Amino acid sequence: MNKAQPPLQNATIRYQSLGLGLLALVLFIVGNWHQAIIGFDSRFVLFAQEMLRHGPSFFPTTYGQPYADYLATSTLLTWLLSVPLGQVNSFTAWLPTAVASAFIVILVFRLTAPYSPRWGVLSIAMLLLSSTFISETRAVSLDQMLAAVALAVFYLGYAHDHFGAAKRLHWLFPLLILGFAIRGPIGLVIPTGVLCSYYLINRQWRQLFSFGLLALALLGACVGLLLLLAKLSGGEVFMQDVIRMQFLGRMDGTEGSSGVLYYFTSSMGNYALAYPVALLVLLAIAAGGRRTPDPALKLVLYCAAAGLLVMLGLSVPQAKKARYILPMLPMAAIIAAYPFQVTQGRLFAWLRGLMLGIWTLLPTLLIIGLVAARKRYPAELESLGAMFALLGVLQVLALLALAKARLRAFGPALAAVLAIWATYIVVVEPLERSLYDTRTFSVAVKTRILQQPAPVVLHGLGKDAKAIKFMVNFDCDKVPLFTQSPAELALIQAPAWLVMSQADFESLTEPRLRSITPTLTGAFDKNPYVLLHLEKMSSP
């Protein structure tokens, strides 16, 4: 055993990590109560709304039918939080992800603080400054939940060998089951691969093969249960949909396709600051030559192996999205903060200076960015005086902290974290919700339809695309009709309410439809949309 600290200090670290986790949770949920639902969140909120009306199920539902791409685990969490309120809102939808993100903060600190509390705190800072972590934390993110599971599995394996936590290994397989329940097969494979990479680098062959084989057997059992539940929920056809969407579709590119190096190149921006700085740290370690690694450096190498495995493993399927490799981010953050753990080496000193410079200047850089953004969105960003004042105060505090040796590392990092999160919560989120608003138009449409009930036809919205963004604001069991072509639309019988884009309306040639004056016009997901009332002709 290589205990990094005596048990008493480990107890102190546990309390400190819980405190940091609670502070992070407050940051993650501040200002989030009844935000408008936009983008990818619409799908999961619609799942929860239907579950709130009809009760729990194995798979989430849309339009009353089971949805094949996910199990209902995350929807169940939102449902449980929404039941006392009687409604689903942004707070109940986001809270499970926020808790998972806070759990990641706790584990990152517990991994690194036994070597140096400064390393632990600055690893958290690098995590909180990473762009995809920020956007996914304040959203419904199954991949963020999976990142928490994967890091927990890695932590249990590492703590067993280094922190004397042998009794906790029995949690490994329940965590793998939880990962599968959240994210399907990939939710079990990624945490398994992360721990297997640790055993491989550590040359623990017996643990590698025993854990790997048991995880493989567990994967087979979970897949069998998944297909059984699919057959019970929707029959043979639905089971085939589950196989296509959760297995084959991601592998063969039918769900989207990107290049093999997509994750390695796009992460330079999507996972800045942690990922690009982590690459520089690894280059500095390699340039330092071969030497016997101390426990802290070994942790860095274990994290590098785990992060690399996640990126390589997820590069195999054709379908790739930036959020899929979130389990890599905590590892990258730990590596990126490593220069503050070592005291020797010119390259590490240069990296410390680089990071301190970025942290210190970030409030000013954000002010410059907001000035540029206001030129593009003058109406939405006209009132930025308070934000500029806050960033100015944080800039002054960062400079003052930089001048004091005791605060030199922590002060600028804290100022940078507060600056970027304040900017995101106060400026970026409202701007996104203004530009991509779907609630205003949808609620206005619902009001008109309730005044004169008739079938609703969604033309050109896509049953699993913009229609979801419309129905999440409708929040009722009314199942609309869907049309994609003008020929299908021409078959619709009056009376009916027609929802379509302004462009689709102007391209109609059917005289019966083209002559209708729009009842309502408004912005929907950054595009002009219209509501038409197709009235039944009165008999002569």
Features from the language model and the residues they span:
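Membrane-interface transmembrane helices that cradle and orient dolichyl/undecaprenyl
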Residues: 113-118, 153-169, 340-343
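Start-transfer (signal-anchor) and selected internal transmembrane alpha helices
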Residues: 1-28, 214-218
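Extracytoplasmic catalytic/substrate-binding loops of multi-pass membrane glycan-assembly enzymes
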Residues: 33-50, 56-59, 65-77, 87-91, ...
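Transmembrane-helix motifs of polytopic, lipid-linked glycan transferases
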Residues: 95-115
